[in-house]
């Protein structure tokens, strides 16, 4: 039986955090037996914001090690670096030439990012969705795991594919969104109205996967909650609901069991319990990561093999696209 293909990308910037892990990476790991997974470290996307070259290279390998430590299995999945496969940029240019300006101008993420970085607005940032579309369409992808903030970009990708197929003949699969039921949107510990983000610089905003036990405990103790002091799954209690979501994913307990466990107990006790569950859950990941960082040659070999595997698919698609549009 042929497995459905899933494409997922993650930028090698900032520190990979609990939101990335619970909202994306854990689902990637859990789905490896079910799907034909392609995981891409999207370093070309990263340079839409000016990066320190040496740090970007280091972060790229660090992210690869973290993903492998989280359980990405190269016997079941493909992991590679975006810039190692030239067809991503080449297809993005062809798509650029087939996307109306109006469609790109409506992308809300460009507006948000350009407001945050008004001195660094570049064409790459504006064209970001075209490269994302190329990433996805290059591999004839069936499903793309997306959070709410990326749904608009996937809708553009679908529109681009449908328009291209209509104008040039059937070429691309039309990808479907895959939105996880739990953990899709882990919020910031300091401000639970905002999604946990790698680009947020505040020290108590998120839990990095490589944080020490002491750092994790301190951050959870300082997490924003409310004055009700009731540990219950009430979405209106946004701070405590966020912590409950994290706790439930790490423990696997039902809502009823968790609420009964902490009935009559204060937020302080609950916060420590969440921290302990996270520390215990991240321990094997951190141990595997420590081993992998000592094996740079192995990391490079794994990533090179991954690029070699996906390049075969990418070249086949790009060759067909070139022929469709009349390029030699």
From Swiss-Prot:
EC number: 6.1.1.2
UniProt-listed GO biological process terms: tryptophanyl-tRNA aminoacylation
Catalytic activity: tRNA(Trp) + L-tryptophan + ATP = L-tryptophyl-tRNA(Trp) + AMP + diphosphate + H(+)
Residues bound to L-tryptophan: 135
Positions of short motif 'KMSKS' region: 195-199
InterPro entries: aa-tRNA-synth_I_CS (IPR001412), aa-tRNA-synth_Ic (IPR002305), Rossmann-like_a/b/a_fold (IPR014729), Trp-tRNA-ligase (IPR002306), Trp-tRNA-ligase_bac-type (IPR024109), Trp-tRNA_synthetase (IPR050203)
Cellular compartments annotated: Cytoplasm
Chain residues that bind ATP: 11-13, 19-20, 147-149, 186, 195-199
Chain ranges for the short sequence motif 'HIGH' region as given in the UniProt record: 12-20
Cellular compartments per GO CC: cytosol
UniProt feature coiled coil, ranges: none
Keywords noted in UniProt: Aminoacyl-tRNA synthetase, ATP-binding, Cytoplasm, Ligase, Nucleotide-binding, Protein biosynthesis
GO MF annotation list: ATP binding; tryptophan-tRNA ligase activity
Domain of life: Bacteria
Family: Belongs to the class-I aminoacyl-tRNA synthetase family.
Annotated function: Catalyzes the attachment of tryptophan to tRNA(Trp).
NCBIfam families cross-referenced by the UniProt entry: trpS
Subunit organization: Homodimer.
Designated name of the protein: Tryptophan--tRNA ligase
Originating organism: Wolinella succinogenes (strain ATCC 29543 / DSM 1740 / CCUG 13145 / JCM 31913 / LMG 7466 / NCTC 11488 / FDC 602W) (Vibrio succinogenes)
Phylogenetic classification of the source organism: Bacteria, Pseudomonadati, Campylobacterota, Epsilonproteobacteria, Campylobacterales
């Amino acid at each position: 039986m042929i497995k459905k293909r899933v494409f997922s990308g993650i930028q090698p910037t900032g520190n990979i955090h609990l939101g990335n892990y619970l909202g994306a990476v854990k689902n990637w790991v859990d789905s490896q037996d079910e799907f034909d997974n392609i995981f891409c470290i999207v370093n070309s996307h990263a340079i839409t914001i000016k990066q320190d070259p040496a740090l970007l290279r280091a972060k790229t390998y660090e992210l690869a090690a973290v993903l492998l430590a989280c359980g990405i299995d190269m016997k079941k999945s493909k992991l590679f670096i975006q810039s190692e496969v030239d067809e991503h940029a080449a297809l993005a240019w062809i798509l650029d030439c087939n996307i109306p300006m109006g469609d790109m101008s409506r992308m809300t993420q460009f507006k948000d990012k350009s407001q945050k970085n008004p001195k660094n607005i570049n064409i790459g940032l504006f064209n970001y969705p075209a490269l994302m579309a190329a990433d996805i369409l290059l591999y004839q992808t069936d499903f793309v795991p997306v959070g709410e903030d990326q749904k608009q970009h996937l809708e553009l990708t679908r529109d681009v594919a449908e328009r291209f197929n209509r104008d040039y003949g059937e070429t691309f699969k039309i990808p479907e969104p895959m939105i996880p039921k739990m953990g899709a949107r882990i919020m910031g510990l300091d401000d639970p109205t905002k999604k946990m983000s790698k680009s947020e610089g505040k020290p108590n905003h998120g839990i990095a996967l490589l944080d020490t036990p002491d750092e994790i405990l301190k951050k959870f103790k300082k997490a924003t909650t409310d004055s009700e002091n009731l540990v219950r799954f009430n979405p209106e209690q946004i701070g405590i609901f966020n912590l409950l979501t994290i706790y439930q994913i790490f423990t696997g307990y039902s809502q009823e069991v968790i609420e009964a466990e902490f009935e009559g107990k204060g937020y302080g006790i609950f916060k420590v319990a969440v921290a302990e569950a996270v520390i215990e859950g991240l321990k094997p990941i951190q141990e595997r990561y420590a081993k992998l960082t000592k094996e740079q040659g192995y990391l490079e070999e794994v990533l090179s093999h991954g690029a070699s595997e996906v390049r075969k698919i990418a070249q086949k698609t790009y060759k067909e696209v070139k022929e469709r549009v009349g390029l030699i």
